[in-house]
Regions:
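Amphipathic alpha-helical packing segments from all-alpha helical-bundle domains
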Residues: 101-108, 123-149, 160-167
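Short, cationic-aromatic polyanion-contact patches
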Residues: 4-10, 40-41, 119, 165-179
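Helix-turn-helix
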Residues: 4, 15, 19, 23-57, ...
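Short, basic, alpha-helical segments at the C-terminal edge of helix-turn-helix-like DNA-binding modules
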Residues: 34, 64-71, 76-78
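Short linear capping/connector segments at secondary-structure termini
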Residues: 83-88, 116-123, 152-154
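Hydrophobic alpha-helical connector segments
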Residues: 61, 76-108
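Hydrophobic/aromatic-rich alpha-helical bundle segments in the mid-to-C-terminal region
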Residues: 114, 147-201, 209-220
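Short helix-capping/turn signature of helix-turn-helix
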Residues: 52, 104, 118-122
Length: 220
């Protein structure tokens, strides 16, 4: 009997989350209410609180899987041993378009991300942003230090500068996803504009770091 009750509870939670997703996408986070979500799920407003404390908890659970994808990318950056790479491999990291891999990974979650960025959903995004940028900054700092150590670059960047660069990249990605034209996926026009902006940033880095190592083929 207990197993049946637990299974029923699981099914109800899944129904509520699906209804919450529908309401969030339809009305936006601010206009969504527990009452609207309950009505969509076909349960009473009081019953919904047996499963969730509020809409922020629901949104957090909806975004959890998507957040895990992003965190898996940044987690893979932790502890990368750049010293094990050849000079050619090390330089190629600079032109590897990691940001495009990130966007491709998130393509199926674009509606949810668009809704998140268009509406104030509490502190969830702020917490995620902090962790994401912190990890990206550490990854980049280790990378630039290795370039300098080998003499491939002639200048070191400060941690604060690297933090600001990581923040800028994160902000550009967020601005792109938040654009109404990208609600159902990144458009080719927006993708081209973003790639061009990242190319400008890359060329600036090349000049500032005075990178003097030639790679074969296209750099970006």
């Amino acid at each position: 009997m207990a197993v049946i009750i637990r299974e029923s509870t699981k099914e109800t939670r899944e129904l509520i989350l699906k209804s919450a997703m529908d309401i969030f996408l339809k009305t936006g986070y601010q206009e969504a209410s527990m009452r609207k979500i309950a009505a969509r799920a076909g349960i009473t407003a009081g019953a919904i609180y047996k499963h969730f404390s509020g809409k922020e908890e629901m949104f957090g659970e909806l975004f959890h899987a998507c957040g895990k994808k992003l965190m898996s990318i940044t987690k893979s950056m932790i502890g990368v041993d750049f010293s094990a790479l050849s000079d050619a491999e090390l330089v190629q990291v600079l032109y590897s378009k990691i940001y495009m891999q990130t966007l491709h990974l998130l393509q199926d979650d674009m509606q949810l991300l668009h809704m998140l960025l268009k509406n104030d959903s509490g502190t969830y995004l702020a917490r995620f942003r902090s962790i994401y940028i912190e990890r990206c900054t550490a990854f980049a700092a280790n990378y630039y230090d290795e370039l300098y150590r080998r003499g491939i670059s002639s200048k070191k960047l400060s941690k604060k500068t690297i933090y600001m660069l990581s923040s800028s990249e994160f902000s550009m990605i967020c601005e792109m996803i938040a654009d109404d034209a990208c609600q159902n996926g990144i458009t080719e026009e927006m993708k081209a504009a973003f790639t061009e902006a990242m190319t400008v940033l890359l060329r600036g880095l090349e000049a500032e770091l005075d990178i003097h190592y030639q790679t074969r083929g296209d750099k970006i």
